[in-house]
């Protein structure tokens, strides 16, 4: 762990974002597991690696770390668990490109929630970014209405739970800056696994699918979230926001190359507008986040 911490923060965030970008092709590669079974096993393995990380980091204070995080930590974990569930649902029912581009709207929801709950003003740059971002979203949803099934369109709608849940988590962190939110990731993993268990019907899946769930939980989101958490500690928020766009760029490209999922030009256009709005806000907006 000390060796990892010696790596520059931006590099850790970038590697973490690259890990997250594999989520789409992993979910699409399951053979027989339904989405709730995928959710259960993915979060089960995620909870294991977070537990190992917490044991290495906190040692004898492992259980105390949960107590210290208190209600804010639980609320943060609950919010993140809904995001985890929405991610699997969206990737299972709609395209990787749509899901990844919708995830990038987190900044829009973050600015909006910050205005209402943190009393942080929305400046002109942020307002322009929000308008641009929502324009991109409307293009993606409009495209979905014309060329996708009702199930795929529902996947796009559910996908919005992800950026909203992540924005809620950040707002909780901002409201309680002294509370360690790392234990909240374990809480999120367990709660999401419970959601999957309830709706899965049965949890037995093939060895092939179990291996994919292991890759998703242990490496894709496990290493991804841990590296981003460590890297964010020494990386300016604006740079983190830009580096996190790696997931939205690599995700659709990986789906294109490995599973031949080619996004329509309208989706690419809408996604490009969303990414531009985030870059615009990151470089020219107030560094509230």
Task: Enumerate the language-model features and the residues they cover.
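Membrane-interface interhelical linkers
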Residues: 1-18, 46-75, 121-127, 145-154, ...
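Hydrophobic/small/kink-forming positions within alpha-helical transmembrane segments
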Residues: 21, 77, 81, 85, ...
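Hydrophobic transmembrane alpha-helices of multi-pass small-molecule transport proteins
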Residues: 50, 54, 80, 112-113, ...
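C-terminal-most transmembrane helix of multi-pass membrane proteins
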Residues: 2, 43, 245-289
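Glycine-/small-residue-enriched transmembrane alpha-helix faces in small-molecule transporters
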Residues: 1-39, 78, 86, 148-175
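Loop-to-transmembrane alpha-helix entry segments
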Residues: 67, 100-103, 119-139, 149-156, ...
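Helix-helix packing/entry segments at the starts of transmembrane helices
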Residues: 11, 99-105, 173-191, 221-257
């Amino acid at each position: 762990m000390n060796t990892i911490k010696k790596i520059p923060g931006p590099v850790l965030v970038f590697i973490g974002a690259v890990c997250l970008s594999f989520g789409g092709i992993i979910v699409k590669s399951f053979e027989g597991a339904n989405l709730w079974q995928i959710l259960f096993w993915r979060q089960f393995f995620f909870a294991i690696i977070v537990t190992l990380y917490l044991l290495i980091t906190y040692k004898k204070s492992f259980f105390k770390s949960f107590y210290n995080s208190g209600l804010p930590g639980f609320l943060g974990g609950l919010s993140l668990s809904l995001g985890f569930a929405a991610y699997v649902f969206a990737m299972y029912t709609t395209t990787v490109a749509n899901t990844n581009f919708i995830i990038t709207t987190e900044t829009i929801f973050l600015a909006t929630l910050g205005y209402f709950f943190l009393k942080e003003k929305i400046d002109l740059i942020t307002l322009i970014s929000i308008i641009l971002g929502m324009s991109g979203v409307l293009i993606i949803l409009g495209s979905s209405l014309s060329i996708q099934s009702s199930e795929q369109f529902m996947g796009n709608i559910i996908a919005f739970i992800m950026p909203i849940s992540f924005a809620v988590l950040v707002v909780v962190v901002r409201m309680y800056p002294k509370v360690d939110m790392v234990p909240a990731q374990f809480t999120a993993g367990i709660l999401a696994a419970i959601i999957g268990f309830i709706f899965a019907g049965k949890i037995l899946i093939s060895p092939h699918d179990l291996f994919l769930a292991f890759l998703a939980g242990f490496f894709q989101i496990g290493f991804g979230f841990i590296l981003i958490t460590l890297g964010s500690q020494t990386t300016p928020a604006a740079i983190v926001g830009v580096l996190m766009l790696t997931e939205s760029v690599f995700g659709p490209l990986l789906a294109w190359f490995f599973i031949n999922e080619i996004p329509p030009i309208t989706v690419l256009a809408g996604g490009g507008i969303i990414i531009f709005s985030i870059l615009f806000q990151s470089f020219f907006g107030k560094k509230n986040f």
